[in-house]
UniProtKB/Swiss-Prot annotation:
Species the sequence originates in: Neurospora crassa (strain ATCC 24698 / 74-OR23-1A / CBS 708.71 / DSM 1257 / FGSC 987)
Domain RNase III as annotated: residue spans: 959-1107, 1153-1353
Family per similarity comment: Belongs to the helicase family. Dicer subfamily.
Record field: compositional bias (Basic and acidic residues): 1-10, 1492-1504, 1516-1528
Gene Ontology CC annotations of this record: cytoplasm; nucleus
EC number in record: 3.1.26.-, 3.6.4.-
Protein name in the entry: Dicer-like protein 2
Motif (DEAH box): 192-195
Residues annotated as binding Mg(2+): E1193, D1339, E1342
Gene from which the chain derives: dcl-2
Length: 1534
């Protein structure tokens, strides 16, 4: 605990002080106040302050600019008392000043301010911020999502540097119970409205369960400061002592400065106003009668709630149905009944006009709600009843008002002062009506600016009443009241307690206060001098209303009666509840009592339940009676509860019983909930904070993806090579064969390095757009020793470089890191331009040399043709500037230069290709040179070609050396043997290298996902599918892969930069000079995804090298997990065996599933796996010990991906698929729509059925009954197909109804879908969307694959099942026909990226029944059928209304590009619009590209003319290309 300035030893002080050590004078002085002339209420309940400064005349000035609060003497007295011990300050609003003194005085520790309501918390936070701006204060409430803060790191981040926290009671209790906020981290707890802290109140429990035990144990605890207007809820002083014991504090009120306190107390004048008899006829109005008749006409048998329970056909559903019908307890019944009862109340209290006004507004509001959006079935059912009610026109002005309301209006009209007041109304429904009357009635509308307030509280988990017309604008109204926009507030009891409102001079109690506390709180609102409190009663002559003293006394008696009744009820509570065990976690201090268990269990079930929409997710309790204890008094019936948890959990965790027997259902349910939660904790599904387990409890959350990060610069192998050239005594050599297009005999070189020469895959170095040199290194490597004192043999690298580059920059005679030695002829720089030009050589030699322009630079050219004389300048594309001066009658050569871009790893484009020039516009020759200005090399031109590609070859060698260093050092333990594969795994596409890692990354991603899913499933057999999905996401997400890559040191091996266009050779001497300089740690910026991708590409490379086991070794090496995570990568077969052992033994296959096993041509070793694979969560629920398919589906999804990816990777040679094509095919064939269609197509068996002959009128019953008969001859034998999907076991009427509707759509669309796939070689996404299958169709496909693999461990067995099902044949067909498989939504995102303004897409979906129902950018990242759970996409089974059809407009960049109509579902409308939009965009883009190409060609023609005209002083005119940009300058669909 932080140092408390009140004493030098605060801990010792707190430990020593207990209940017995309290100063007896403290209590005595408090009690003595009761005996003095001033009544206790006047002392601490009516202490109503004036501002220390004179109030401003303008209300706005009073409330909008908070003045600095100045403490008065009696406030300082309370403050000083609070510094000595824990106290409960008994004042009204001045008590906040006492608390304010604490945080201005304390210099350490965190202070927690507690309030009963969010509104009061917001008010206190605002005051603290304005009065102490130097201290960071925050407010926490449920709207901040506090209930989802389930990690210590979140709480630590929120509370970082926070000195003051303001919250409601429950938030601190929960945070402490889960050990997120420990008591020793607080220096002070301030409890506003402290009189509430009794019984099971959260703060009473915090004190008794945590504070007092910690203090007794000698642990540091915070100080306590209670604030209240009235610690006394009755005239029993024992209540004060109880409150003091609970809060470990003593009650204090001013005794020394009491006179000053009284000077600031303004007691309002109280007037009792009688309104007499109600004076209104209680007979319902005509509209009320019609409403009641509509209610009685409702057929409860057609109520959606009833229909739902009838269809379930379970014991639980039947019992619930019986109670629902008996009590008329459906949602529709309750809502309509509530409306009518509220109308009766309004009729009685206000009058007939008000009742009709309320009903008219309510019915109109509900019908309007039904017209908007997509209401649930219950509200459509209500709407049918409401539409039958004729709504009359009613007067806008209030008429026929009750005497009670008329009295209220007269009181308001007669108030003398400038009114600032509150009207307190008991019922919520009355608030808005009374507000409307005051605002519109002639007596009051001009004088009162009226608003209403009913409170912001809501019941968690309770459905909102759609027919509740009460407004939720409370904070706006309250703020307007504070700022003076309103001068009258009509409110419920929400304004009684705590909330700060302006000083009022008028308070009216429209209804009698319910208890003494309510009366005192209302009276305290009238704090202005000469203020008035009006108490409206039916009969002013009653004894209770003679004067306010009698009224107060009567209310005390009533309140005491309530307390006595409550006390009697509490006596019925089982006293053993206090001795029930507590679940406490020693490591964190988190604890849970039996009182908390049910809320904890509900929260757990909501978090972990199956995402299926067909299941109830809350726990279900069954109560049973047990024999009463004969020895117990009265032999009361004892009860025990059994709780059943969702089917997502393992069978042994789904059923739990209460530990003890109880006398009430509530306590038995609490007991069962506690036992269930304890079992979940023991099973590891609840963490150390007693919250549902998350993977972040084991693996730390690494935060968000940063996008780009700084990593080490790429490893450079050349300094090591240079050093070896100087120091090593060994050399290494491989044979390098160069295949040159057009040259019959390949060239051969010795490729020599002073380090082991890496083996490289055949390397293509492109010479132009269509041809490339191919360099092949031999598999065999030779090692030999350098002879001491020699240069280690010939080196032709220098000559090769000089042939190609000496004309561009000087090639110095130094040692190049790579040594190439021709095996067939000697190469020397002296042979460059060594011979006179001889035209005969070009006619006879198959490999002629280069010619060079003798101009000092020896510019090299290839000779394409020899002319006998100088051609006219008009025939030359690029004539020399001195062409006219050149000799006429000498041979000329037509030539072309060596391109600067030759030797790239990818084909050259037209602009780079020197060979792509063709004669045009009458220009026959590109370049000509006279024979008098040229010389020839002394060796064929092909050697210069080899020299020209040395830069690219050097780059490829560098990549291999980088990969070799990684493979043989950091990855050495894996014993990988394919260096070219590892090299590929390190090269990004941005490097423009010979290969890139994208294909390997694709398969590595799939393998990693499989390993993660398998290992998590095996290690955590109790973890449900949602938790397993968290494991998978945590293990394979890019942030973790990026971190692992950097930790392992992969970042310096990633090759991501392209070669420089301004290449210059770097020699051994250069590297040696650099090594003499200090080495600095250089970094580079890189995409975090690229850093993560290399991990996956290496996993893919390991798989290609050694299969799944080698891949798993690589995964374990690159992605280690801490021991604390409880996760450890393990062998594939070990994990599979564990999963196999988890499956129940000796399960007997039902007759229903036997045909499926037989049709699969696979016999399960454990039948339970097939049963589990075909069991929907609705069938694995109450009363069964079976598991549902969710875990197997989770694993089967990963297995299916592996099988498909292996098939895609098998496409090699000319059929090899690019990374994008592989991704599109995988995404297409494993999408839920496709698998669902295949599940309907896969016929498992056929059964014989007999049907009535449709031509037999007799058998059809179309003849008179006396003549009608069915005979064997009347029947026709047929075969009925039993497709795969029919073998799914479920126990849900909704699932059955969905299957029926889906199969009808399937039968209608089947032929079209098959034709599109097998005849037109395309995937019909729109038709599949029209079919709209639910996700469970694809789930059983994946779960079946998972079951076969777990049972057999055979990939082939799984492939055989997929072949029978048709999935692999479909994939083969798509590959063979090169079908277009991309989903339209994905294609549209590529053609029109939604993140660019000019191509931003928007779908507008329109219903012929409901108008526009959705608008915005809506895509599916991966096309799939809709999950039958909590998903963000539109549900296919969201049943349209009768004859409802949909249309969709698609806008791209604000321009409409598609408009489709007649769609059966919203998803079909969206997909069809995307398809049409893609066609339109591609057509527009084609036109634009053609125009662009034509403009470019015209521009080239004018440029050539311009070159010719330049000699004449003219310039070529520039051709303008059409501007295809929008107003913002963005390119449109370019």
């Amino acid at each position: 605990m932080d140092q408390d300035p009140r004493k030098d030893n605060p801990v010792e002080m707190d430990v020593d002080r207990d209940d017995s050590s309290q100063d007896p004078d403290d209590n005595e002085s408090f009690k003595s106040a009761l005996d003095e002339p001033l009544d206790l209420k006047e002392l601490y309940q009516d202490a109503l302050e004036k501002p220390s400064e004179e109030p401003s005349e303008e209300l706005n000035d009073q409330v909008s600019t908070p003045a600095a609060l100045t403490a008065r003497a009696y406030q300082l007295e309370m403050f000083e008392a609070s510094l000595k011990q824990n106290i409960i300050v008994a004042l009204f609003s001045d008590r906040v000043m006492v608390a304010d003194g604490h945080w201005q005085w304390q210099d350490s520790g965190r202070i927690w301010f507690l309030t009963p309501t969010v509104a009061l918390a917001r008010q206190q936070h605002r005051v603290l911020q304005s009065q102490i701006p130097s201290v960071k204060a925050i407010m926490l409430c449920g709207q901040d999502g506090v209930d989802s803060w389930s990690e210590q790191a979140v709480w630590d981040a929120v509370l970082l540097n926070v000195r003051i926290v303001v919250s409601t009671y429950q938030i601190l209790f929960d945070a402490n119970a889960h050990s997120f906020v420990r008591l020793d981290s607080l220096s002070l707890i301030v409890i506003d409205e402290a009189h509430n802290c009794s019984g099971s109140h959260p703060i009473a429990r915090l004190m008794t369960e945590a504070y007092l035990p910690a203090k007794k144990a000698g642990l540091p605890v915070p100080s306590i400061l209670g604030l209240t207007a009235s610690p006394l809820k009755s005239n029993n002083l024992a209540d004060i002592e109880k409150l003091e014991q609970v809060l470990d504090a003593v009650c204090r009120t001013p005794t020394i400065h009491r006179e000053e306190l009284l000077a600031h107390v303004n007691r309002p004048e109280m007037l009792v106003v009688s309104y007499g008899d109600s004076g209104t006829d209680p007979t319902p109005t005509d509209l009320m009668t019609r409403f009641l008749e509509a209610y009685h006409r409702l057929d409860i048998s057609k109520d959606p709630d009833v229909l739902l329970l009838k269809a379930q056909r379970t014991e639980r559903a039947r019992e619930k149905l019986r109670q629902m019908i008996t009590k008329k307890d459906t949602l529709a019944q309750k809502e309509l009944r509530g409306v009518y009862n509220r109308a009766l109340l309004v009729r009685r209290e206000i009058g007939p006009w008000a009742a009709d006004y309320y009903l008219t507004r309510t019915v109109s509001h509900m019908l309007a709600e039904l017209e908007r959006g997509e209401p649930p079935a219950q509200h459509r059912y209500i709407g049918e009843a409401l539409r039958s009610i004729p709504i009359p026109a009613i007067s806008k002005e209030p008429i026929q008002l009750s005497p009670k309301v008329q009295t209220l209006l007269k009181v308001l009209a007669s108030h003398q002062q400038d009114p600032v007041g509150i009207v307190f109304v008991k019922e919520r429904v009355m608030v808005s009506i009374v507000t409307h009357i005051i605002s519109t009635h002639p007596l009051t509308k001009d004088r009162y600016r009226t608003a209403s307030m009913i409170g912001t509280a809501s019941v968690p988990g309770k459905a909102r009443n759609h027919m509740d017309m009460t407004k939720k604008e409370d904070m706006t109204s309250l703020e307007g009241f504070r700022l003076g926009r309103f001068n009258l507030l009509v409110a419920t009891s929400v304004l009684e307690e705590g909330i700060d409102v302006p000083i009022c001079n008028l308070v009216i109690c429209f209804d009698e206060p319910s208890n003494i506390k309510s009366f005192i709180q209302r009276r305290g609102r009238a704090r202005e001098v000469s203020s008035t409190l009006y108490l409206m009663v039916q009969n002013a002559s009653s004894e209770s209303a003679t004067d306010w003293h009698n009224l107060e006394r009567l209310m005390k008696e009533r309140y005491e009666d309530e307390m006595r009744q409550n006390a009697e009820l509490e006596l019925l509570d089982d006293p053993r509840i206090g001795s029930y065990p507590v679940l406490e976690v020693e490591s964190t201090g988190a604890r849970m009592t039996i009182r908390d268990a049910r809320s904890h269990l509900n929260h757990f079930c909501a978090k972990v339940s199956s995402r299926s929409r067909y299941l109830q997710k809350e726990p279900y309790f069954v109560i049973r009676q047990v024999n009463p204890d004969p020895a117990s008094p009265g032999r009361r019936t004892l009860l025990q509860a059994t709780v059943h948890l969702p089917a997502s959990l393992a069978p042994d965790l789904r059923r739990h019983e209460s530990l003890w027997t109880w006398t009430s259902e509530k306590l038995a349910i609490m007991d069962a909930s506690f036992q269930a939660y304890k079992a979940l904790y023991n099973a590891g599904l609840v963490n150390e904070n007693l919250l549902p387990t998350k993977v972040s409890d084991f693996l730390a959350d690494l935060g968000d993806d940063p996008g780009h990060i700084w990593v080490k610069t790429q490893f450079d192998p050349w300094p090591e090579v240079a050093y070896a050239w100087q120091e090593s005594s060994s050399l290494y050599s491989r044979r390098l064969t160069v295949l040159v297009p057009g040259v019959e005999n390949p060239l051969e070189f010795e490729f020599i390095l002073p380090v082991p020469v890496p083996y490289m895959a055949p390397l293509k170095l492109w010479w132009n757009a269509t041809s490339a040199l191919t360099l092949i290194t031999s598999p065999e490597m030779q090692e030999f020793r350098k002879q001491e004192g020699t240069s280690a043999g010939p080196d032709h690298s220098y000559a090769l470089l000089a042939m190609a580059f000496a004309h561009r920059f000087p090639i110095q005679g130094r040692q190049y890191p790579i040594r190439l030695v021709s095996t067939r002829r000697k190469l020397d720089v002296d042979g460059i331009a060594a011979l006179e030009f001889d035209p005969r050589l070009y006619e006879s030699s198959p490999q002629p040399p280069l010619v060079r322009l003798v101009d000092g630079r020896n510019m090299p050219y290839f000779v394409t043709k020899i002319l006998p004389s100088k051609p006219p300048v008009e025939l030359i594309s690029k004539p020399s500037t001195d062409h006219a001066d050149l000799p006429e009658n000498v041979p000329y050569v037509v030539c072309k230069p060596i391109g600067k871009a030759v030797g790239q790893f990818i084909p050259l484009d037209a602009a780079q290709d020197q060979d792509s020039w063709t004669p045009k516009n009458g220009k026959l020759y590109r370049k000509v040179l006279p024979s008098t200005q040229i010389r020839m090399d002394n060796f064929p031109a092909v050697f210069a070609q080899v020299g020209a590609v040395i830069p690219a070859f050097t780059r490829a060698v560098e990549m291999s050396l980088v990969a070799a260093d990684l493979m043989y050092n950091r990855l050495g333990c894996l014993q990988l043997d394919n260096l070219p594969l590892i090299t590929t795994a390190l090269i990004s596409s941005g490097s423009r290298g010979p290969t890139n890692y994208e294909r390997l990354e694709f398969i590595g991603d799939t393998i990693l996902k499989f390993c993660a899913c398998l290992t998590a499933s095996a290690l955590f057999p109790n973890h449900h599918e949602r938790l397993l999905s968290q494991w998978k996401d945590k293990l394979v997400n890019n942030v973790r892969l990026c971190r692992a890559s950097r930790d392992f040191g992969l970042d310096e091996y990633i090759i991501n930069s392209a070669a420089s266009k301004k290449w210059r050779p770097k020699f051994v001497e250069d590297y040696m000079d650099e090594m003499k300089s200090p080495i600095s740690a250089e970094t580079r910026q890189m995409s975090s995804k690229m850093v993560a991708d290399v991990v996956e590409s290496l996993i893919g490379a390991a798989y290609m090298c050694g299969g799944m086991s080698k891949a798993l070794e690589c995964v374990a090496l690159l992605l280690p997990t801490p021991k604390s995570s409880q996760f450890k990568w393990q062998e594939i077969e070990l994990s599979r065996t564990q999963l196999f052992e988890f499956a129940p033994k000796d399960a007997i296959l039902s007759k229903q599933l036997e045909p499926l096993e037989k049709a699969m041509d696979y016999t399960f070793n454990k039948k339970s796996l097939l049963i589990e694979a075909m069991t929907h969560p609705s069938c694995a629920g109450l009363g069964t010990n079976e598991s549902c398919y969710e875990r197997l589906e989770f694993l089967g999804d990963a297995i299916l991906d592996v099988i498909v990816v292996k098939r895609l990777m098998a496409e090699t040679g000319p059929n090899e698929l690019a990374h994008n094509d592989m991704h599109e095919h995988l995404s297409s064939v494993v999408t839920a729509d496709i698998m669902a269609f295949l599940a309907m197509e896969w016929v498992i068996m056929q059964t014989d059925i007999n049907e009535i002959d449709p031509t037999n009128l007799d058998a059809l019953g179309l003849l008179p009954s006396s003549q009608s008969r069915i005979t064997p001859a009347s029947l026709v034998s047929n075969k009925e197909d039993w497709p795969f999907w029919r073998f799914m076991r479920h126990n849900s009427p909704q699932v059955g109804a969905t299957q029926t509707a889906t199969i009808e759509r399937y039968l209608t669309l089947r032929d079209e879908i098959r034709d599109a796939i097998w005849k037109h070689n395309t995937l019909p996404w729109a038709l599949l969307a029209r079919m709209g299958p639910q996700k469970f169709y694809s789930d059983i496909v994946e779960s079946l694959i998972g079951a076969v693999w777990v049972d057999s461990g055979s990939w082939k067995a799984c492939e055989d099942v997929l072949t029978q099902m048709g999935l692999l044949p479909l994939l083969d067909h798509l590959l063979e026909t090169k079908a277009h498989v991309m989903h339209p939504n994905v294609e549209l995102q590529i053609l029109a990226p939604p993140n660019k303004r000019a191509t931003r897409t928007e779908f507008v979906i329109i219903s012929n029944k409901r108008g526009i129902i959705s608008s915005g950018t809506e895509f599916l990242d991966e096309p799939s059928a809709v999950d039958d759970g909590l998903v963000s996409v539109e549900p296919y089974d969201d049943t349209p209304e009768h004859d409802e059809v949909f249309s969709c407009k698609l806008f791209v960049g604000g321009k409409q590009v598609a408009d489709v109509t007649g769609a059966a579902t919203k998803e079909e409308a969206r997909v069809r619009a995307a398809e049409k939009g893609c066609l339109v965009i591609k057509a527009e883009r084609k036109v634009w590209n053609e125009a662009k190409a034509a403009a470019k060609e015209d521009k080239g023609h004018n440029t050539e003319n311009g070159d010719a005209n330049a000699d004449n002083g003219q310039s070529g005119e520039k051709e303008e290309v059409p501007d295809c940009r929008d107003a913002d300058g963005d390119t449109v669909m370019n």
